[in-house]
Every structure is written in C-alpha cells, then in structure tokens.
C-alpha cells in the first residue's frame, strides 16, 4: 500500500530542513497541551515532516535531500466534526495557522503548511456512515480512501464511479475539496 511520497532522507536526529526557509509559526507547550486535549496530536519531527508534503514532484525531489517545503509544528487527527470545530475555534483564538490534509495526493503543494502551525489530518475519520439503496446516496467520512469506499459498496452491487488518477491514495474529503474531476467521472 502506497500512502506516502518517497521516503524522506533525515538527519541523525530525525529532523528535516524547510526548503522555503521562511519563518513558521511554532507552538507553545501550553498550546500543544490544549491541542492534545481536543484530539490526537503528534509533534514528533518525523510525523510533522511527513505530514508537511504531498505528491508535488518538487517535494519528492526535496525529500531526497532531507527537505520539506515548510514544516508544521503539530499534526492533529480529529475523529469527529465536533473535534474539528473545537480545534478550528481554538486555533483561531490562538492565531495558529491550520492546513487541512487528507491523503495528500495532490501534486501542486496545496496541503503544505506554508506558515507552520497545525496540519489537520482527516484520515482518522474513515468509513461509510450509511448507504441508501433507494436514492443511491452514501454518507462517507472525509478521511475514507477511494479503494475502501469501493470495497464497502461492491457487495451491494454499487459503485461510486469516480476514479481519479490518485484513486488509491486520495480521500473522499479531498475529492470534494478539490472538485475532483477525472477519468471515468
């Protein structure tokens, strides 16, 4: 299963460099503690570096020399819309930048946290909530990957019929956010 661009080359301490080199907004210990109370939060260098890039070809090249475009201070993984609302409200109050990300399958750098802060990773919100076989509608959580959605629908004789090139590594939330248009769509 490929869910990440190429492996990052890191220094012995696990750190990577920011390619853009401009100042980014870090987090105070009190802010990290508050974020941790809201949802799962990771501040480790390896996790924040990985979450700070996508499939943009330049980021893959920079990864070979241990660089990410810009690095988030934390990766937050909410599991509910209530946690997302609380997280966004808190970050707004504290003036912490937030960059939304899912599968990070984009190739233009849209999920790069240019100003640091928090990456709001939706991939902890996976699954199919409901399927209405009469109206042929499905309610899906935003972090659900394309193959998982199709695997859930196939036994019912249903398909979404949406197959972007990034199908295996893209999430439904990303399809919606980017007005996904693709082959067979």
For the regions a protein language model found, what residue spans apply to each?
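N-terminal flexible segment immediately upstream of the FAD-binding catalytic core
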Residues: 1-89, 106-136, 165
